[in-house]
Amino acid sequence: MQEKHYEVIIIGGGITGSALAYVLAEFSGIKNIALLEKYEGLATLNSKASANSQTIHCGDIETNYDLQKATEVKRKADMIVKYCQKHGYENKFLFQGQKMALGVGESEVELIKERFEKFKELYPYLQLFDKEELKKIEPKLVFDGRGEERAEDIVAMGVQSGVYTTIDYGAMANSFVQNAKNVEGKTCDLHLNTEVQNITKVGDKFYIRTANRLSLSADFVVVDAGAHSHKMGLGQDLSTICIAGSFYLTKQKLLNGKVYMMQNPKLPFAALHGDPDLLAGGCTRFGPTALTLPKLERYKGCRSVPEFFQSLNFDMDVAKVIWQNFGDSEVRDFLIRNIGFEIPILGKKLFVKNARKIIPSIREEDIYYAKGFGGVRPQVISHSQKKLLLGEARIGENPGIIFNMTPSPGATSCLGNALRDAKSACEYLGVSFDDAKFDAEMMR
C-alpha cells in the first residue's frame, strides 16, 4: 500500500482533536491534515452529549476554580461561543439558560456571598439570589415534600438569562471537522474505524501503524487519545487513574436551569449538580457519581483495560499518592458511597438522599438510573511531585509530537487548547499562523 503523508496527523476524534483540525485548517498555513478516529464516528466517547453534563464551564459557578483559573477558563469558553455565533449554531447545539451555584447551610451561604463579591467584576452578569428570590425562579430548591420551606438557609449566585450555558459537544465536534473540510485549498482527511497501534519516529518523520493497515506518516503528530506516550517511552513521570461518572434522570422537568453544589476542597471530583438535559426533553439529570474503573473507555467492553494499566504506570510513588488522596476517611467514605450509587435498587435510595440537598422534595420514584450515560475522566498523577494534578495535562517533551489529556473543563477549553497546539505545530514546521484572523473571529 502506498504511504499517505501529512504535515499533521491528529489522533482522536473527540472535541479536542476535532477543534485542532478546524483551527489548523482555518487559521494556519498547514495544508495537509488527517484526523484518525478509532470508532465509527466522531465524539463517540466522552464528548458525546450523554457522556458529560453539556455545560459550558466558564468559571462563574464552578466553586472549585479560583479567580486565576476562572479568568483563563472564561477566555477559552468565550472562544467556543464566538465560534458557534460565527457559524449560526445558536439554538441548534448552543443554548442560553439559567444557572447557579447553590450554598446550603450557614457556612456555604457565607462562602457563596464571599465568592460573589470576588467574582462579580469578572462576570458582571452575576446575581445573588436569596431564598425569597429562589422561590420565584427555582422553587424546587426551597420547598420540601410537604410544601414547607426547607429549614436551612440557602443562597445562590448565578444568572437567569442572556448567557450561553449549554452545548452539545458531540455535535460541535462534528461541525469542527465539516468546517475544516470546507476550507478551500486545504486537505483534511477523516479516517474513521482507524485504531492507532503504534507511533514510531524515524528521522524527522512519524510513522503510524493502524489496525486497519493504513500506511500513514506525518511531520507532526498530536495525540488526543489513549496511552500512546507510555508506549513511546515518553511521559513516564505521569500516571492516570480513571474515574467514571454516572447520572440519574428525573421523569419530568424539575429544575429551570443548571444548579451546581459547592465543591468539597478535599475531593478531586465534580460536586453534584442538576442540569436540564438536551437529550431528555429538559428533564433533570443529576450527577456525576465517581466510580474508579480499570479502563479508559466506558461502554466499550474491556478492550481499553490493557491501556489503563499502561497509563497507570504503577510504582511506589503512585501508591503513595493514591493512599494520600483516597486513604482520607472523608474521601474513602465518598468513594464507597459512590460505589453504592451503581447498585440496582439500593443505588437509587442512596442517591436520592444526596439529591435532596438540591431538591428537598425529590423522591425515589422521581428518578431512574440513566443507562448508557456518563463517561470516564482521567485523573493525572505526577511521580516527581507525588501528588494528584487536577485538570489537564500535556506532554510535549519530544520534538514534533504532543500528547494531551483533557478532563473537565477540556471540552470547554477545546479551542484554546487547539490554538496552543496549532501554534506549536506551526512553529515546529516553520509555517505561518494567522493570529490576527483568529483574534478577530474567535476572541470576544
Per-region residue spans from a language model:
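Dinucleotide-binding Rossmann-like beta1-alpha1 core, especially the glycine-rich loop
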Residues: 53-140, 293-295, 299-305
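Flavin-dependent oxidoreductases
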Residues: 19, 199-201, 210-307
